[in-house]
Amino acid sequence: MPKMKTNRAAAKRFKKTANGGLKSANAYTSHRFHGKTKKQRRQLRGTDMMDSTNVKRYKKLLSNI
């Protein structure tokens, strides 16, 4: 049986954490900041943890990472 291929699009967007979770950049951060409050912009900095209901599915895409 052939090896599973890593989904390259997912590999560029998500990183595995030491505890087995997945983290990614926040959405809504590329443009249109004039419509967002200062608090919203501040909270969108950094990374976000993926919800546990989706982690199992995305780990299959990231099988070799």
Swiss-Prot record:
Region annotation (Disordered) ranges: 1-51
Coiled coil (UniProt feature): none
PROSITE patterns named in the record: RIBOSOMAL_L35
Gene Ontology molecular function, alphabetical: structural constituent of ribosome
Keywords: Ribonucleoprotein, Ribosomal protein
InterPro entries for this protein: Ribosomal_bL35, Ribosomal_bL35-like, Ribosomal_bL35_CS, Ribosomal_bL35_sf
Taxonomy, superkingdom: Bacteria
SUPFAM superfamilies in UniProt: L35p-like
Feature: compositional bias, Basic residues: 31-44
Single GO BP term: translation
GO cellular component: cytosolic large ribosomal subunit
Database matches in NCBIfam families: rpmI_bact
Similarity remark: Belongs to the bacterial ribosomal protein bL35 family.
Name of this chain's protein: Large ribosomal subunit protein bL35
Organism listed in the record: Pediococcus pentosaceus (strain ATCC 25745 / CCUG 21536 / LMG 10740 / 183-1w)
Gene that this polypeptide is encoded by: rpmI
